[in-house]
UniProtKB/Swiss-Prot annotation:
Catalytic activity: ATP + H2O = ADP + phosphate + H(+)
Region (Disordered) residue spans: 50-97
Domain Helicase C-terminal intervals: 460-606
GO MF term (any one): mRNA binding
Signal peptide per UniProt: none
Keyword Thylakoid attached: no
Sequence motif: DEAD box, positions: 367-370
Name of this protein: Putative DEAD-box ATP-dependent RNA helicase 44
Keyword entries, A-Z: ATP-binding, Helicase, Hydrolase, Nucleotide-binding, RNA-binding
Entry-linked InterPro entries: DEAD/DEAH_box_helicase_dom, Helicase_ATP-bd, Helicase_C-like, P-loop_NTPase, RNA-helicase_DEAD-box_CS
């Protein structure tokens, strides 16, 4: 049966495809097999060469043959026999040569493998570099010093100089007394030295400052240090911020409004500027710097201040806080950013959901650390710090020198008070920190305490607001949300002020609106809870009113710290009732420290004389 043309073409294509697959498919050959194939190729080449030589010889013989004479058969037979014998010996020689060459190549390869293993496991001795001695500073001549012909003066006039004689005056040369000259110059130097010491430090250049000037400078600004190898503080912005630029861990305890944000933002930007730019290759490793704060309002405020500095450098800052869409925040993080400002709870959520990582974050700021501990954020803060890379921590010993090119973790911790819990957190995560104390937290604040009853508080509040006027602003602090709504409702009925509210029960948009309008002085009274007691900077706040006394003195310090910021004065008024006796002792001590007036009722009360938890009469029965 004849095969059709299509069938024939199909069979041919399948065969061609199969042959091509067999040719392209890699086949594993053993070492012995490869050696056998190489030997066979050499033998084939030799046989082919011999075959071509025989054909060439036969052709030449046929050309030279006369054809008329009979061929000498015997002589031709002997010649062919000799040729076969020579060819056999040549073949054997070539085979031995090929075999020896293959064995030599195998031996060289084996020696290379052995040398590589020796170099890997035993190591090699590196050749020592020849030490070149430095040339001597004093050049030595080949001759003796006594042979120098220029050592003595050859001119007779200069060999015997004429001694000058006194001409006039008091027996001095040219009437000039050298001793009097030296005395006058010494007196001039002493006067200049005294004038230099009496000059104020602000009139001197940075390199002219001595230890006395630095001591006076620190006393003028109430700056104190605890630590070693601490650089001098900066006098103005042109001299930068020394501690941050040296990558030292810092614990800052200072008054509110003293520029703490700039103190960690500027060194942070200087640190980021030394790192590679944020691109698609490294933005998946997370931000370069992290700032943790206790409240959403403080996070947004720090974000605004950071953007003011970072926008000129092209750095991006993102805030991560609660009460906002975590998906939108995750989208911002996925686009890459150098700085993240976050509250501990929301940041931990993003870490658990893999929205952000901290693989390359080596700059950490804990702002209002005592407030975060009071709000029970210490476990979340510890979990976040444990996620950060620990391979670049500074050495625990202070004497060890840091490598210049290596990047170490830098940690800033700011607080208005130094509590034991803050010290415990610092000992765990900070290495050889410098404790910097700047100013007094209540230096520019006038504190007033009014003993009253709960029913009389609102009437006293109305009187304070009436005395405030329309051009000044005040913040009223209470302890509960319900009381915020109660006070605002009654103040709106009276209609004597423009009042707004802010507490944790409101949405983030409402809180931002109230705070922004209060800063613009559209409202002059803000009633709030402790959500506004930390970190926020409100300019020209005239008065703080504690409608309810807080439960701790730490909260009291931060509440009244909203006024009297950045060197300006302010007034803090507190309504105190007998139900607040747990803080009587601490409040009395605070007022005495600030030289403020202590109400007689508070001074005479038994609870103000002893620290809470102590029993003064426990030894009275002995």
């Amino acid at each position: 049966m004849k095969q059709s043309f299509e069938g024939f073409m199909k069979t041919a294509m399948e065969k061609k495809t199969l042959d091509f697959d067999n040719l392209t498919k890699p086949v594993f050959l053993t070492k012995a097999h490869r050696k056998e194939l190489a030997l066979k190729r050499c033998q084939d080449e030799i046989a082919d060469r011999d075959r071509r030589s025989i054909v060439q010889i036969s052709r030449s013989n046929s050309d030279n043959d006369d054809g008329n004479r009979p061929r000498d058969v015997k002589r031709e037979r002997h010649r062919s026999h000799d040729h076969d014998r020579n060819r056999e010996s040549d073949r054997e020689f070539r085979e031995r040569e090929v075999k020896a060459r293959v064995e030599k190549l195998e031996m060289v390869k084996r020696e290379k493998e052995i040398n590589a293993m020796k170099e890997q496991y035993l190591g090699t001795t590196k050749p020592k570099k020849r030490v070149i001695m430095k040339p001597s500073k004093n050049f030595r001549f080949d001759w003796e010093n006594t042979e120098d012909t220029l050592s003595g003066e050859m001119n007779v006039l200069y060999q015997n100089p004429h001694e000058a004689q006194p001409l006039f005056g008091r027996g001095c040369r040219a009437g000039i007394d050298r001793r009097e000259q030296k005395k006058l110059m010494t007196g001039k130097h002493e006067r200049e030295k005294r004038e230099e010491e009496d000059k104020h430090w602000s009139e001197k250049k940075l390199e002219e400052m001595n230890e006395r000037d630095w001591r006076i400078f620190k006393e003028d600004f109430n700056i104190s240090y605890r630590g070693s190898k601490i650089p001098h503080p900066m006098r103005n912005w042109e001299e930068t911020i020394p501690l941050g630029l040296e990558q030292r861990d810092v614990i800052g305890i200072s008054a509110t409004g003293s520029g703490k944000t700039a103190a960690f933002v500027l060194p942070m930007l200087a640190y980021i500027s030394r790192l590679p730019p944020m691109r698609e290759e490294n933005q998946t490793e997370g931000p370069y710097a992290l700032v943790m704060v206790p409240t959403r309002e403080l996070a947004h405020q720090i974000e605004e201040e950071t953007v003011k500095f970072s926008r000129y450098l092209g750095f991006k800052a993102v805030s991560i806080t609660g009460w906002e869409s975590i998906e939108k925040q995750a989208l911002k993080l996925s686009q890459g950013c150098e700085i993240v400002i976050a509250t501990p709870g929301r940041l931990l959520d993003c870490l658990e959901r893999r929205y952000v990582v901290l693989n390359q974050c080596n700059y950490l700021v804990l702002d209002e650390a005592d407030r975060m501990i009071d709000m029970d954020f210490e476990p979340q803060v510890s979990e976040v710090l444990d996620v950060m890379p620990c391979s670049n921590l500074k050495p625990e010993k202070e004497d060890e020198e840091l490598e210049e090119k290596k990047i170490y973790r830098t940690t800033y911790m700011f607080s208005a008070t130094m509590l034991l819990s803050v010290e415990r957190l610092a000992r765990k995560f900070l290495r050889n920190p410098v404790v910097v104390t700047i100013g007094e937290t209540t230096k520019f604040i006038t504190q007033q305490v009014i003993m009253t009853k709960e029913s009389d508080k609102f009437s006293r509040l109305k009187k304070l607001i009436d005395d405030l006027g329309d051009d000044k602003t005040a913040i009223v602090f209470v302890n509960t949300r319900n009381k915020v709504d109660y006070i605002v409702k009654n103040l709106e009925k009276v209609g004597r002020c423009r009042v707004t509210t802010l507490h944790a029960g409101k949405s983030q948009e409402q809180r931002d609106y109230s705070l922004e309008e209060f800063k613009k002085k559209r409202f002059n009274v803000l009633v709030t809870t402790d959500v506004l007691g930390r970190g926020l900077d409100i300019l020209d706040l005239a008065q703080v009113i504690n409608y309810d006394m807080p439960n701790t003195m730490d909260l009291y310090t931060h509440r009244i710290g909203r006024t009297g910021r950045a060197g300006k004065t302010g007034v803090a008024t507190t309504f105190l009732t007998l139900e607040d006796k747990d803080v009587f002792y601490g409040l009395k001590q605070k007022l005495n420290e600030c030289n403020s007036l202590v109400p007689p009722e508070l001074a005479r009360h038994e609870a103000s004389k002893f620290k809470p938890g102590t029993f003064p009469d426990r030894f009275s029965h002995f």
